[in-house]
């Protein structure tokens, strides 16, 4: 479809070629220039290579050979969104490129006699360009450019002429693409000023006179139809006014005078109808739906050596019936069919005709009737030329393709009357199709200037699929000023008496011209009879026109009549010379009255505009696309109900193109398809791309299939390509990291658009089902045809057998008689043999078509199965990806919100304190409010939302603190009551302790308020204490509270169906280099990987994942500070590939750790600095120590990120239920790494860089909204980094069991000053009560000094339990309380050389506390360095002990966490022991109880 700028560009170009051929590929437009000429190449330059045949187009001069098959370039799947004919695809090229690629025009001897043609082509092959030329020569040019000359009717479209030396040439492939220089009418268009210009400029045109011949003959034939004189009147009336014009218009290709004089066999009104050249032309023009009947007179027979062929379209079938062969049929029509046929060149009028055009219409109709009353054929012809011009302004809203009108939106449902005859008299060359804006002014479409300066409308292009319905969007209501009512003819007959004189003069001139011809008497008689007929039928003119409304437009293509053509030719010669002068004079007189009459018509055509739409619905009752149009509203101006139908329907040029579009739109999702379907689809794509497919899919059955399925295929193709476009756009947005924070792409509208694809699933399925039904119907039809042919062949063979049997039964007679009988028999069987051969040919062709239909059916069946099985999967998969992306964005926003809120509170607190210092107490509040207002710009449109957010955040924090205080007070009160009851039974020593406990309780509230204020002021520094749970609950609209204990027991007790364990590791972790004698060597990980592989061969429950991705930095920053992460990045980037360096030491030995700026050194109670056994030196008085234990290399940070990524991936698989538990072989370890790397009181990070278990815990908390996560650390070293990060965060519960002694790294988790310590006092049952009581007194004294409610309660419980002489492990354990105690930390230190039984008894405390906590997820810092063979510690555990430890934790996970447990490797430095412990750990995780 040409664009506006293409049409405007053509206006400035006046070329020898038609405009459609200039824009077509290879310089030839098969749609508009179907007339081609056979030229044997041997007649010029000898034969071509391998006997190729050559043809040229007589309209544009383009040549091609039979071997030069044009193959349309295939659509590349990568250009998926722009490749199906909607939008701007790669085939949308500019006009300059088209002209550069077009084949240059070269004149030949045949074309030298052709005058320069107008760039405007007709719509169809047999039509003549009407109203374009300024003289008779211009008419001939229109004939040449539009492919209808005097030899047009000598042959049909597909047969070879008797004198042609070669068969019909193959027509070049029709490139009906959008880049051609014509456009398909999609929307209804207003009457442009081009048609007005045609009417105005054609006052001196003889082409209008030719048009008038057909229309005049048509009207008089309608009149004569009532009188019963069909053929004589039609022939006589069609001849009288066009003879002079025909002789002058056929100068280029041979004189029609010679043709006409050679055919003078008619002697009467009825006469012989053997020569049906003009009749055939009339039928051909009518079959083209919008061609004018003047072609009937214009076309004649010639004996030229060239062969006319009509290329493409359904007209070949019609022309094969109506040809010039002696055996062609001459059907006799009924009166009603004649009336329809004689008014069958029109179409539905276009909206908003100009008044001038309607005025022309009025005068034309008036002149028709008055001229009939005056018995003047010349005047009738002149007036009918204007009538044709008027009817050409009435555009058909439907697209027209190769003679068959395309149905409009309302044709499938409306059933009404036929349109008036005016709408059938439209010349296709006068049609004008809409501009995008559907305006009436001439600025929208600038007319193309022809050779003779006549303005012409832009070239139009019919769609290929003649029956496929056009899908329109937002079609507007046609203007009521477009159609002349039937009653207007009668009204106008009374207003045209002024032209009678001219008509009489024309009649006299015609009589004079007839006297100069050979058959004067016959002409005069015919004129007299014709005049009488005209007089008798003028009274019925209006009624006959009204009767035409009862016939359908579709029937006009199949109505034939056979006037006496020889008699017509004689009459044409008689009036040829003088007719043109009178026609020109009369047109000038008529032009003056048109404008006045047209104003009157505008008020009369309002009612007829909508009735005409109902008439047009009758035209396509045989269309197979009515069910496709059912979803669309019956009114033509109603919008499309389905939003996925965009703009317009762009038909495919061939079935092959249609199939390629569809498969290319689905093949982009091949990765989502099963293997067998993917291979089948690739095979189909390969088959369709082969060169032989062009001929295989170019049959009658393929055209029929294309007409049936093209619309549905277009909708399916468009759906899949829009789906691919949407998904691609989403991916690009998700991968774009530079989207501003203020821009939210995935809003509600975008998600609704994507969800709409899922809603269309059923609609596309129905489209597929419709296509399969249509293909099944076509296949069944072909099978029936094949069976009929087989039946006929069998019957013929029976006849042959019977004949032979009869011959054998005849008695022997004389030899001469036998010869005669044999000769007669052979002569009688010769036609039968010919019939059988033709039937065999038809049988083979039908068999090929059946196989082709079956292939297409299997193709659509495959795509239908793909749609059913994979469409929803594709949509759901992308939906999950969108959900994951949105969750990540929300979680990151939550973290940012929390950080910003803390900073805001800190800023507001700082301003509040400064105001208190600078101002009086009376002005403090006012100043504080003013400062608060100045923190945020008041012009910010989000200030209200931000203020609400901050106030809600403060309220949540206050409420949580108040709730915590209330809970503590309630617990204290309950403990007090219990203790009071127990203390009543104690001695005086216990009473003193109760008094101290009461004093402690009284001071608890003050201590809590002080600690609350201190935490609020230091919130920005202690970022690890941020309560992200509070922010998460706020953003998610206060999600549900913690589940009660009884409910959680029932829910969490659901065990997985099948236990699966995943082991994760990455070989990049081996690239973390350390010195050769370092205990944390890569050999450790190699040993663990070997153990994993060995265990996988023994158990089918282990799943190995060896390619985890690196973790995103945003999750690292939830645990570690940005400064520390930047330090690691800078340090590792500066190192060479094999360089190893201590973490906190420069080349000059200076400390570079993040804590080097700290001025505080942890001091023990004795005033000495804490000794760090893991460091090379100890420090006092604030001096920092270098880390001689932890080393880094070039890839150390990447290895740590891989380990952290493996941890998060393990959590994902466990939380999603893919596996029940997971083991991560992490290296380097991580539980000693604090927020800034080094923890307080240490100068070494204990081989650790990133704290994997803390990163995983934060990841699970934020991503899966978990409220209770337990972290158990049974490494021999205390997890000081994990404790520092998770302390005081109530969403986590950290429990560590480890060895503790002075000088043993890290020196925390058991000494004085440690938090949450549980001391195990092993004693004998024979120890008396007093010794135990004294021990408890010491603990109680320490507890009274530390003012902690929870620890005091526990101590009192332990004290009372000791008074009751309990002997269990839990009764022997007490928690050491101090001022730094955190309620979510439990440390169980063990003495060196502790036995395995002591370790297991102490570990039972952890199990009991886990059951009380009821976690939702369990994470394990799994260290195997407490093994007996590991020399970094002195504990004595064996492999079976680790099995028992792991089994007990797995049981807790099965009880409370649905089996969700993730274990991360920490320590373990003996290679053999590490391997054995890994296998023991995996076996305990994978076993069932």
Curated annotation (Swiss-Prot):
Biased composition (Basic and acidic residues): 989-1001, 1010-1024
Annotated segments matching region Disordered: 135-259, 281-556, 915-935, 955-1024, 1151-1185, 1325-1374
Catalytic activities: N(6)-acetyl-L-lysyl-[histone] + H2O = L-lysyl-[histone] + acetate
Keyword Hydrolase: yes
Annotated EC: 3.5.1.98
Compositionally biased region (Acidic residues): 1325-1335
GO cellular component, one term: cytoplasm
Biased composition (Low complexity): 135-163, 190-259, 281-306, 325-399, 431-450, 486-553, 915-928, 959-988, 1158-1180, 1336-1367
Principal location: nucleus
Biased composition (Polar residues): 400-430
Compartments reported by the entry: Nucleus; Cytoplasm
Active site: residue positions: 1232 (proton acceptor)
Entries under Pfam families matching the protein: Hist_deacetyl (PF00850)
GO biological process, any: epigenetic regulation of gene expression
Keywords: Chromatin regulator, Cytoplasm, Hydrolase, Nucleus, Repressor, Transcription, Transcription regulation
Keyword Metal-binding: no
InterPro entries from the UniProt entry: HDAC_PDAC, His_deacetylse_dom, His_deacetylse_dom_sf, Ureohydrolase_dom_sf
GO MF annotation terms: histone deacetylase activity; histone deacetylase activity, hydrolytic mechanism
Role description: Responsible for the deacetylation of lysine residues on the N-terminal part of the core histones (H2A, H2B, H3 and H4). Histone deacetylation plays an important role in transcriptional regulation, cell cycle progression and developmental events. Histone deacetylases act via the formation of large multiprotein complexes.
Membership in a protein family: Belongs to the histone deacetylase family. HD type 2 subfamily.
Full protein name: Type-2 histone deacetylase 1
Organism: Dictyostelium discoideum (Social amoeba)
Lineage, highest ranks first: Eukaryota, Amoebozoa, Evosea, Eumycetozoa, Dictyostelia
Gene behind this protein: hdaD
């Amino acid at each position: 479809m040409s664009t506006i700028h293409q049409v405007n560009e053509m206006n400035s170009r006046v070329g020898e070629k038609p405009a459609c051929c200039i824009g077509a590929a290879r310089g030839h437009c098969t749609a508009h220039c179907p007339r081609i000429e056979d030229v044997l190449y041997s007649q010029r330059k000898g034969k071509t290579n391998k006997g190729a045949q050559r043809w040229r187009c007589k309209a544009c001069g383009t040549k091609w050979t039979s071997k030069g098959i044009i193959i349309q370039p295939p659509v590349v799947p990568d250009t998926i969104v722009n490749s199906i004919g909607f939008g701007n695809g790669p085939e949308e090229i500019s006009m300059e490129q088209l002209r550069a690629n077009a084949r240059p025009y070269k004149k030949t001897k045949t074309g030298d006699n052709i005058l320069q043609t107008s760039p405007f082509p007709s719509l169809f092959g047999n039509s003549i360009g009407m109203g374009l030329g300024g003289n008779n020569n211009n008419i001939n040019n229109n004939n040449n450019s539009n492919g209808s000359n005097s030899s047009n009717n000598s042959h049909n479209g597909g047969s070879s002429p008797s004198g042609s030396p070669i068969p019909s040439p193959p027509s070049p492939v029709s490139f009906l693409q959008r880049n051609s220089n014509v456009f398909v009418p999609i929307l209804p268009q207003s009457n442009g000023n081009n048609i007005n210009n045609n009417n105005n400029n054609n006052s001196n045109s003889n082409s209008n006179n030719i048009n008038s011949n057909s229309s005049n003959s048509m009207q008089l034939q309608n009149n004569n139809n009532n009188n019963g004189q069909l053929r004589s009147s039609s022939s006589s009336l069609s001849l009288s006014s066009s003879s002079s014009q025909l002789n002058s218009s056929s100068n280029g290709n041979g004189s029609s005078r010679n043709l006409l004089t050679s055919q003078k066999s008619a002697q009467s009104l009825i006469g012989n109808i053997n020569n049906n050249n003009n009749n055939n032309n009339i039928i051909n023009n009518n079959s083209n739906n919008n061609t004018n009947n003047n072609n009937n007179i214009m076309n004649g027979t010639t004996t030229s050596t060239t062969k006319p062929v009509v290329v493409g379209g359904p007209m070949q079938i019609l022309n094969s019936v109506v040809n010039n062969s002696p055996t062609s049929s001459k059907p006799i029509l009924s009166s009603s069919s004649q009336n329809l046929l004689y008014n069958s060149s029109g179409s539905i009028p276009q909206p908003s005709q100009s008044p001038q055009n309607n005025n022309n219409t009025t005068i034309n109709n008036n002149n028709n009737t008055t001229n009939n009353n005056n018995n003047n054929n010349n005047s009738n012809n002149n007036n009918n030329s204007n009538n044709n011009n008027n009817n050409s302004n009435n555009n058909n809203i439907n697209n027209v393709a190769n003679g068959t009108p395309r149905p409009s939106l309302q044709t499938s449902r409306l059933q009404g009357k036929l349109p008036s005859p005016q709408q059938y008299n439209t010349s296709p060359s006068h049609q004008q199709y809409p501009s995008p804006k559907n305006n009436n002014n001439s600025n929208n479409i600038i007319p193309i200037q022809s050779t003779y300066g006549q303005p012409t409308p832009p070239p139009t292009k019919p769609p290929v699929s003649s029956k496929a319905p056009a899908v329109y969007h937002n079609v507007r209501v046609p203007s009521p000023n477009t159609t002349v009512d039937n009653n207007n003819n009668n009204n106008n007959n009374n207003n045209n008496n002024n032209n009678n004189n001219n008509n009489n003069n024309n009649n006299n001139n015609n009589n004079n011209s007839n006297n100069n011809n050979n058959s004067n008497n016959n002409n005069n008689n015919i004129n007299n009879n014709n005049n009488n007929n005209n007089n008798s039928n003028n009274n019925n003119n209006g009624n006959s026109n009204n009767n035409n409304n009862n016939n359908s437009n579709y029937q006009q293509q199949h109505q034939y009549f056979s006037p006496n053509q020889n008699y017509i030719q004689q009459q044409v010669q008689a009036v040829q010379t003088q007719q043109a002068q009178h026609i020109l004079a009369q047109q000038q007189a008529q032009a003056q009255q048109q404008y006045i009459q047209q104003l009157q018509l505008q008020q009369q055509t309002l009612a007829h505009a909508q009735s005409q739409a109902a008439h047009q619905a009758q035209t396509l009752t045989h269309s197979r696309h009515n069910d496709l149009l059912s979803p669309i509203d019956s009114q033509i101006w109603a919008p499309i109900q389905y939003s996925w139908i965009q703009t317009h329907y762009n038909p495919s040029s061939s079935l092959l193109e249609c199939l390629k579009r569809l498969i290319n739109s689905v093949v982009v999702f091949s990765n989502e398809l099963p293997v067998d379907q993917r291979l089948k689809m690739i095979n189909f794509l390969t088959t369709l791309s082969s060169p032989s497919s062009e001929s295989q899919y170019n049959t009658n059955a393929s055209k029929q299939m294309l007409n049936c399925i093209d619309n549905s295929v277009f909708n399916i193709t468009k759906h899949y390509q829009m789906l691919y476009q949407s998904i691609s756009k989403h991916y690009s947005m998700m991968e774009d990291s530079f989207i501003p924070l203020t821009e939210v792409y995935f809003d509600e509208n975008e998600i609704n658009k994507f969800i709409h694809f899922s809603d269309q699933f059923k609609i596309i399925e129905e489209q597929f089902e419709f296509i399969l039904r249509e293909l099944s119907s076509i296949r069944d039809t072909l099978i029936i045809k094949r069976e009929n042919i087989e039946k006929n062949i069998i019957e013929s063979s029976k006849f042959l057998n019977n004949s032979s049997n009869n011959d054998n039964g005849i008695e022997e007679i004389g030899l001469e008689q036998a010869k005669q009988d044999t000769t007669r028999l052979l002569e009688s069987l010769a036609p039968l043999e010919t019939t059988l051969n033709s039937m065999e040919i038809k049988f083979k062709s039908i068999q090929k078509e059946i196989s082709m239909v079956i292939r297409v059916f299997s193709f659509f069946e495959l795509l239908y199965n793909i749609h059913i099985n994979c469409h929803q999967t594709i949509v759901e998969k992308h939906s999950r990806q969108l959900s994951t992306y949105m969750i990540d964005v929300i979680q990151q926003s939550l973290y940012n919100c929390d950080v910003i809120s803390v900073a805001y509170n800190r800023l507001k607190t700082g301003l509040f304190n400064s105001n208190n210092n600078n101002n009086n107490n009376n002005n403090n509040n006012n100043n504080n409010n003013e400062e608060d207002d100045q923190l945020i710009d008041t012009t910010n449109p989000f200030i209200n939302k931000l203020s609400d957010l901050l106030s809600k955040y403060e309220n949540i924090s206050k409420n949580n603190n108040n709730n915590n205080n209330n809970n503590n007070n309630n617990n204290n009160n309950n403990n007090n009551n219990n203790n009071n009851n127990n203390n009543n039974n104690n001695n005086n020593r216990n009473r003193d302790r109760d008094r101290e406990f009461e004093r402690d309780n009284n001071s608890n509230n003050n201590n809590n308020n002080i600690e609350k204020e201190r935490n609020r002021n230091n919130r920005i520094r202690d970022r690890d204490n941020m309560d992200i749970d509070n922010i998460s609950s706020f953003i998610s609209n206060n999600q549900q509270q913690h589940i009660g204990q009884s409910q959680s027991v029932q829910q969490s007790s659901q065990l997985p169906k099948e236990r699966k364990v995943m082991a994760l590791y990455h070989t990049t972790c081996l690239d973390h280099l350390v010195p050769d004698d370092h205990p944390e060597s890569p050999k450790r990980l190699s040993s663990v990987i070997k153990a994993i592989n060995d265990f996988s061969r023994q158990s089918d429950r282990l799943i190995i994942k060896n390619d985890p991705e690196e973790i995103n930095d945003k999750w690292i920053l939830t645990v570690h500070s940005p400064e520390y992460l930047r330090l690691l990045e800078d340090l590792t980037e500066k190192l060479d590939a094999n360089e190893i360096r201590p973490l906190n030491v420069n080349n000059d030995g200076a400390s570079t750790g993040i804590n080097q700026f700290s001025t505080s050194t942890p001091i023990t109670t004795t005033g000495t600095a804490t000794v760090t056994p893991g460091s090379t030196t100890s420090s006092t008085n604030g001096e920092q120590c270098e880390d001689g234990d932890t080393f880094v290399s070039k890839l150390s940070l990447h290895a740590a990120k891989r380990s952290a990524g493996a941890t998060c991936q393990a959590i994902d698989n466990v939380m999603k239920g893919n596996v029940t538990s997971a083991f991560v072989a992490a290296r380097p370890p991580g539980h000693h790494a604090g927020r800034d790397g080094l923890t307080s009181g240490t100068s070494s990070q204990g081989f650790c860089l990133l704290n994997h278990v803390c990163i995983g815990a934060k990841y699970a908390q934020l991503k899966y909204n978990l409220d209770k996560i337990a972290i158990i650390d049974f490494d021999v070293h205390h997890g000081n980094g994990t404790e520092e990060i998770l302390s005081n965060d109530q969403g986590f519960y950290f429990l560590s069991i480890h060895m503790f002694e002075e000088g043993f790294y890290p020196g925390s988790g058991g000494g004085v000053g440690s938090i949450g310590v549980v001391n195990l006092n092993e004693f004998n049952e024979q120890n008396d009560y007093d010794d135990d009581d004294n021990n408890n007194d010491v603990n109680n004294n320490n507890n009274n000094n530390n003012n902690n409610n929870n620890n005091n309660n526990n101590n009192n419980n332990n004290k009372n339990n000791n008074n009751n002489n309990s002997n269990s492990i839990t009764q022997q354990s007490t928690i050491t309380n101090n001022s730094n105690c955190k309620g979510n930390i439990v440390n169980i230190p063990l003495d060196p050389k502790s036995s395995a039984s002591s370790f297991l008894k102490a570990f039972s405390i952890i199990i009991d506390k886990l059951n009380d906590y009821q976690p939702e997820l369990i994470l394990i810092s799994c260290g195997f360095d407490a093994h007996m063979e590991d020399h970094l510690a002195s504990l004595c555990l064996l492999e079976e002990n680790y099995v028992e430890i792991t089994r007990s934790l797995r049981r807790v996970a099965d009880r409370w966490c649905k089996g969700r447990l993730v274990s991360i490797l920490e320590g373990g430095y003996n290679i053999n022991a590490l391997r054995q412990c890994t296998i023991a750990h995996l076996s305990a995780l994978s076993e069932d109880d």
